[in-house]
């Protein structure tokens, strides 16, 4: 692997980021991870929804940094299968799991606002901010994360089609080492390392979030149609942070 000097990422200009992304596009995912762990600002952390294909990035990162903090946002509305999946992968991969939760319980939120996810786009956005965006922002701040790894892939939705491998968000670098992977790439990696899909994958769930805003994929649907009643794909974490 050809590594760029550390100063290339310490204070990059937009031109530097363009050149850096062009360079990283030529590397394998594991080489991108190695580069970012070496040259990115500390602390590094990985966020994971423990969704359909999350085992890939969890394995990819922990092969190189076993104790990397893994941030899970527990909205209080995850599928029971997701909690069990998180437990299983945490045990298998010896994850340094850091669970963050909203400041307000689900019961108190519903007492104040009702079922926000049933109140159109305005309600969904408010719900996502309360239960996902705020806890993630707090996690990144409290853990002093300088290099944030994600499992975003361009093929997941139209809104993610231009996802760069590295981008700067505020004072933080966001790294998506499998941004260019296809579903087949994911399948091959899982097979090669005997890693599981989420338990709901076999039931037709291709994108898995909260139980009340996730539905099975059906013929003719896009992956993004399975979330938030087809109104939107993103929960806000990768838009607002």
From Swiss-Prot:
Catalytic activity: [thioredoxin]-disulfide + sulfite + adenosine 3',5'-bisphosphate + 2 H(+) = [thioredoxin]-dithiol + 3'-phosphoadenylyl sulfate
EC number: 1.8.4.8
Enzyme class: oxidoreductase
Subcellular location: Cytoplasm
Main location: cytoplasm
Any one cellular-component term (Gene Ontology): cytoplasm
Residues annotated as catalytic: 235
A Pfam family matched in the record: PAPS_reduct
InterPro entries: PAPS/APS_Rdtase, PAPS_reduct_dom, PAPS_reductase_CysH, Rossmann-like_a/b/a_fold
Pathway: Sulfur metabolism; hydrogen sulfide biosynthesis; sulfite from sulfate: step 3/3
One GO MF term attached to the UniProt entry: phosphoadenylyl-sulfate reductase (thioredoxin) activity
Function, in words: Catalyzes the formation of sulfite from phosphoadenosine 5'-phosphosulfate (PAPS) using thioredoxin as an electron donor.
Family under the similarity heading: Belongs to the PAPS reductase family. CysH subfamily.
Name this protein carries in UniProt: Phosphoadenosine 5'-phosphosulfate reductase
